[in-house]
Amino acid sequence: MGSRAAGSVLLRHLCPRVSSSTSAAAHAHAQRPPLAGAGGGGVALWARLLSTSAAAAKEETAASKENTGSTAAAKAEATKAAKEGPASATASPVASSYWGIEASKLASKDGVEWKWSCFRPWETYSPDTTIDLKKHHEPKVLLDKVAYWTVKALRVPTDIFFQRRYGCRAMMLETVAAVPGMVGGMLLHLRSLRRFEHSGGWIRALLEEAENERMHLMTFMEVAKPRWYERALVLAVQGVFFNAYFLGYLLSPKLAHRVVGYLEEEAIHSYTEYLKDIEAGKIENVPAPPIAIDYWRLPAGATLKDVVVVVRADEAHHRDVNHFASDVHFQGMDLKDIPAPLDYH
């Protein structure tokens, strides 16, 4: 009985509040304006939406026209600059790039602006042309004999193909001779990284050798203009020789360096024959290319004969370095144990 009395009292208090809430909701519904599609209020609201969309469309059209105009102006300026060509570029050179890298302005010893980007004034030198050209490593052990006769076998097809066209022969020789230094330097570099040890300067020495041989090629490209089939031959020979020397150096560095030593001996012989034909008048002694004059610090009136003399001296130095490197390995030592002959020209 007590719970029933309490329930009846609670109902008497709640009923008036529920009825008042319901009437308030009905009154609010009656006062709310109709939505779209429900009379004049909907039409007005739809008109406002249409006017807003139209304004936005006009703004987008104006912005699009403005962007199109600016793009057209930029294209016109670029076309004008392209038509003006080098003169415009010379008049307003780019001082620095986005990355802050500025083109260095160098000059030679006589104050003339340096025109070569492939080498710098401090990388030029005067080779020692008094070096002994007749040095020869006599093959005694098996590996030496393998290296010696491998090089001799490679000379046979070269003699047949080029005969006495020593300009093209030198070009082909330098495309091959520039490979060993790069391969050896690369493998020593990777070994230094793996073992956390220095190379004794041999990485730099071998890479300098590769760069020097490449400069020989750049020089003889100015002297002998290769034909299309000679360029194709260079592609084939370089591809085969690079992979063969790479595998050979992995298997036996002492054999690889000995092969290069004998290869340089053959290069000395080829350049000696080249000089004989120049002196005999069989090959015209043309003026030396400008790149050769600056690279080897030759006199202004230098000729092709002077170029061949300094290139032959370079090959003799490379012969000594590679035979020396092979001797180091034959004595059971690593190249890092013996200081490299840096700047040995």
From Swiss-Prot:
Gene Ontology CC terms: mitochondrial inner membrane; mitochondrion
Oligomer status and interactors: Homodimer; disulfide-linked.
Membrane-related topology note: Multi-pass membrane protein
Pfam families: AOX
Residues involved in Fe cation 2 binding: E213, E264, E315, H318
Stretch forming the transit peptide: 1-50
Gene3D superfamilies: Alternative oxidase
Induction behaviour: Is not induced either by drought, cold and salt stresses, or heat shock.
Class of enzymatic activity (EC top level): oxidoreductase
EC number: 1.10.3.11
Principal location listed in the UniProt entry: mitochondrion
Signal sequence range: none
Cofactors (names): Fe cation
Name the UniProt record assigns to this protein: Ubiquinol oxidase 1c, mitochondrial
Function: Catalyzes the cyanide-resistant oxidation of ubiquinol and the reduction of molecular oxygen to water, but does not translocate protons and consequently is not linked to oxidative phosphorylation. May increase respiration when the cytochrome respiratory pathway is restricted, or in response to low temperatures.
GO-annotated biological processes: alternative respiration
Localisation: Mitochondrion inner membrane
Transmembrane segments: 170-190, 232-252
Gene: AOX1C
Keywords, alphabetical: Disulfide bond, Electron transport, Iron, Membrane, Metal-binding, Mitochondrion, Mitochondrion inner membrane, Oxidoreductase, Respiratory chain, Transit peptide, Transmembrane, Transmembrane helix, Transport
Family the entry assigns: Belongs to the alternative oxidase family.
Methyltransferase keyword on record: no
